[in-house]
Design a protein with these regions (language model features):
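A hydrophobic, multi-pass inner-membrane permease signature
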Residues: 1-187
Length: 187
């Protein structure tokens, strides 16, 4: 009988065998996997560095920088100027067009600024009194207590990297660099 069923009538892996038998899909999985790992790692590193720096009250012109981050998030530059910038940086049709532009997500930076701004300044000042540099404070004190933020950031970034099809559609013409999300969209 016809109809919609909650469970499959017959369990089979034939579709996966068919899919993984096609080189184009295997390559798309490899590109997506590498993009997700590299992009997530670099996004977490850059976001932590930038958002920690911008969250510090003693940063010279800090209010201006924070305003520019929020302003840039609300006012986008547009697709054509963005494409021209990527072309001038020679990122079109390269793997790095996936990773480099996504390293600094302004939403992630704003969330990070709020998180790092909530860390008590007495904790940071006591480390500086003991002779710790800014980098040592960040690595030895701030990062260990920031694991909830880092885990959330890594999860959001990984999902964003894996599901992104737009950049593969606009900035990549080479079939070998297409991602799974793009393949699922066009096929």
């Amino acid at each position: 009988r016809g109809g919609v069923f909650l469970w499959p009538r017959v369990f089979t892996l034939d579709t996966y065998k068919n899919l993984l038998g096609q080189k184009i899909w295997v390559n798309a999985f490899i590109v997506s996997f590498i993009r997700t790992i590299v992009g997530t790692f670099l996004t977490v590193c850059m976001t932590c560095l930038v958002s920690y720096t911008l969250s510090r009250k003693e940063l010279m012109f800090g209010k201006i920088y924070r305003f520019l981050v929020v302003f840039a998030m609300y006012v986008s530059g547009g697709l054509i100027p963005y494409y021209i910038v990527l072309k001038n940086l020679h990122l079109i049709n390269t793997f790095w067009v996936y990773v480099i532009p996504s390293m600094l997500n302004l939403f992630f930076i704003i969330v990070g600024m709020n998180f790092f701004g909530s860390i008590p300044t007495a904790l940071i000042e006591s480390a500086k009194l003991d002779g710790a540099s800014e980098l040592r404070v960040l690595i030895k004190i701030v990062m260990p207590i920031s694991t909830p933020f880092i885990a959330t950031l890594a999860l959001f970034s990984a999902v964003n990297q894996w599901n992104s099809w737009l950049d593969s559609s606009y900035y990549v013409n080479t079939e070998a660099l297409r991602t799974v999300a793009y393949r699922m969209l066009v096929e």
